[in-house]
């Protein structure tokens, strides 16, 4: 008899983490999920209602600021997925990150995430967990000067430049990834890092409808103003949440996988995104038209991402599926 493998998802109630939990259960894994409070009535019941959860999901309380709180959740698991490193846009006092100096930005925005990630990795190492997959962001992959097609190996953001521009939230991902890579190398861990941005598709917790693209798409469906008053001269990178979860599992399941992987399907200019949305929602409130020539969309080299072997929905499909799902929700109208 083959024993089921166990995995741990840190940040199980997050947008990404909850989808990894769902995908892991569907693949037959025993899943340990961590939340700050595993009894939270606004979070836990929605995870416990997932297919397969009754027999294969256990929830644990853990806080990334406290390394030892992860010991129980990590005991006996084969891989830990770290999906709790959400962007921080303000410090404990509520002061916006963009108003901080470097000392405060590092102390209150960057280092809590870096130290939290390392706490989880130290706990995993202590429990003998050799496989780690981290959810980061494409914000760590913007080199200067910009390149036409960026890749995960050569192209990094400059954290000093990010801090100089008061982009401490973005710099957090850059600093965290480098620290995690160093720790993994020193402790013989196989580390993969997924780099997503705009995440579309069904959400698992109702609270996730209050932010993310699902919120402004719901507004458009209801005839309200959406995200922009005017089409921005910029692009947006996108992926379906189910495909992103599949990439996370593939990075774990492929023993040759390690390093950074883009977690996006592609990037479209906002002008093209709104054109597609208007095709799907002919009565929607369109933002004011772009007046200037559109800048090129972000270009990617997807060689490494494609090596994981996951088929991804294209942008028209992920937009349509997200809109159809929102329309079917009883609270949309």
What does each of the following model-derived ranges do?
Residues 275, 291-311, 317:
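Conserved C-terminal active-site "lid" loop/helix of NAD(P)H-dependent oxidoreductases
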Residues 233-235, 245-294, 322-333:
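Mid/C-terminal beta-alpha module of Rossmann-like enzyme folds, strongest
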Residues 3-29:
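N-terminal Rossmann NAD(P)H-binding glycine-rich loop of SDR-like oxidoreductase domains
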Residues 37-115:
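NAD(P)H-binding glycine-rich loop region in Rossmannoid oxidoreductase-like domains
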Residues 162-192:
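Active-site Tyr-X1-5-Lys
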Residues 186-189, 201-216, 250-261:
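Glycine/proline-rich active-site loop of Rossmann-fold NAD(P)-dependent oxidoreductases
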Residues 160-166, 199, 206, 212-239:
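A conserved pocket-lining segment of Rossmann-fold NAD(P)-dependent short-chain dehydrogenase/reductase
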Residues 86, 91-167, 192:
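Conserved Rossmann-fold NAD(P)-dependent oxidoreductase catalytic core, especially the SDR/UDP-sugar
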């Amino acid at each position: 008899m083959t024993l089921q493998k166990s995995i741990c998802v840190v940040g199980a109630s997050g947008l990404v983490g909850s989808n990894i939990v769902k995908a892991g259960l569907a693949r037959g894994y025993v899943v340990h999920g961590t939340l700050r409070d595993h009894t939270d009535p606004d979070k836990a019941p929605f995870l416990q209602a997932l297919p397969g959860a009754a027999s294969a999901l256990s929830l644990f309380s853990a806080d990334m600021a406290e390394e030892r709180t992860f010991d129980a959740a990590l005991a006996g698991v084969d891989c830990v997925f770290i999906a709790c490193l959400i962007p921080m846009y303000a410090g404990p006092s509520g002061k916006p990150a963009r108003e901080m100096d470097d000392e405060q930005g590092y102390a209150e925005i960057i280092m809590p995430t870096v130290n939290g990630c390392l706490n989880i990795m130290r706990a995993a190492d202590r429990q003998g967990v050799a496989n780690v997959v981290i959810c980061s962001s494409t914000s760590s992959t913007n080199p200067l000067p910009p390149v036409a097609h960026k890749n995960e190996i050569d192209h990094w953001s400059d954290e000093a430049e990010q801090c100089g521009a008061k982009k401490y939230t973005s710099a957090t991902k850059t600093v965290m990834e480098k620290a995690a890579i160093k720790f993994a190398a020193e402790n013989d861990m196989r580390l993969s890092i997924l780099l997503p941005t705009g995440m579309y598709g069904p959400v698992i917790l109702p609270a996730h409808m209050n932010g993310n693209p699902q919120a402004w798409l719901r507004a458009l469906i209801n005839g309200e103003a959406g995200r922009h008053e005017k089409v921005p001269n910029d692009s947006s990178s996108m992926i379906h949440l189910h495909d992103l979860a599949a990439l996370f599992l593939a990075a774990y399941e492929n023993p040759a996988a390690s390093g950074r992987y883009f977690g996006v399907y592609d990037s479209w200019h906002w002008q093209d995104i709104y054109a597609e949305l208007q095709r799907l929602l002919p009565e929607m409130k369109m933002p004011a038209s772009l007046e200037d020539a559109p800048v090129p969309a972000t270009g990617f080299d997807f060689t490494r991402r494609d090596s994981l072997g996951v088929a991804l929905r294209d942008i028209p499909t992920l937009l349509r599926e997200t809109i159809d799902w929102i329309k079917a929700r009883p609270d949309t109208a």
